[in-house]
A protein has these predicted regions:
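Terminal amphipathic helices with adjacent charged low-complexity linkers/tails
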Residues: 1, 124-185
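Glycine-rich phosphate/ribose-binding loops and adjacent secondary-structure elements
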Residues: 1-95, 99
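Non-catalytic terminal/interface segments that mediate subunit docking, oligomerization
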Residues: 1-26, 161-196
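Weak global preference for isoleucine
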Residues: 7, 16, 34, 49, ...
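Glutamate identity and glutamate-enriched acidic tracts
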Residues: 15, 20, 33-35, 58, ...
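Active-site or pore-adjacent capping/gating segments
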Residues: 67-134, 138
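Generic structural signal of hydrophobic/aromatic residues within well-ordered alpha-helices
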Residues: 93, 115, 127, 153-157, ...
Length: 196
């Protein structure tokens, strides 16, 4: 089995992986073919907007949902010994569960309202219009410290068209997200006739 430290601390920041994925898909003319999903430490509407600006169109929430339902972050989910009954099948421990579905409904309602408010502040009405718009991200130099002032975010925040040194005219027409349905050219395959 892998060491416990690998289980607990392995991984990469979603910002880095998401930015690289977006740029690679755009450079290869494939961005309009898939929907990119991100998860990991998404808690607030600002987190959702930040991930969308970097290229995500779908979002996974895990820990936030557990906390809304009463999780105390005991890190015992995999042991079937959750003391508040969120992640256990033990009837005695499940009796401690105090969560309600309405708590999750409220969480997502407030999340959606917050995302709408931030979209309005950015001047957009549709969420899909901000997907992959790294040009809207501004670096706040006042937040830098002595150790962080030399960080260069240009490669992280560039759009895919300019991620490699080629004129934009050499790139196929791309969209930052799925603009329409996918076309797999399977309308006339033999299976359609055999199954019908």
């Amino acid at each position: 089995p892998p060491p416990a430290s690998s289980i607990r601390y392995a991984g990469v920041s979603p910002e880095i992986g998401l930015s690289e994925t977006q740029q690679t898909l755009v450079r290869n003319g494939l961005r309009g073919e898939i929907e990119v999903q991100v998860d990991g430490q998404l808690k607030t509407p600002r987190d959702v907007i930040a991930m969308a600006l970097l290229g995500a169109g779908e979002f996974g929430f895990g820990t936030a949902q557990l906390i809304v339902l009463g999780c105390l972050l005991m890190r015992k989910c995999h042991t079937n010994a959750c003391p508040v009954g969120v992640a256990t099948q033990d009837p005695a421990l499940r009796a401690h569960f105090r969560g309600h579905s309405q708590y999750l409904i409220n969480y997502y309602r407030f999340m959606a309202e917050g995302v709408r408010e931030l979209l309005a502040q950015l001047g957009f009405t549709r969420f899909t219009d901000i997907i992959g718009r790294t040009d809207l991200i501004e670096i706040d130099a006042d937040k830098f410290t002595e150790k962080t002032r030399h960080l260069d975010f240009s490669r992280l925040l560039c759009s895919g068209e300019f991620a490699i040194r080629r004129p934009a005219s050499q790139f196929p027409s791309v969209t930052s997200s799925i603009a329409g349905g996918q076309h797999h050219l399977i309308e006339d395959v033999l299976d359609r006739k055999l199954i019908a």
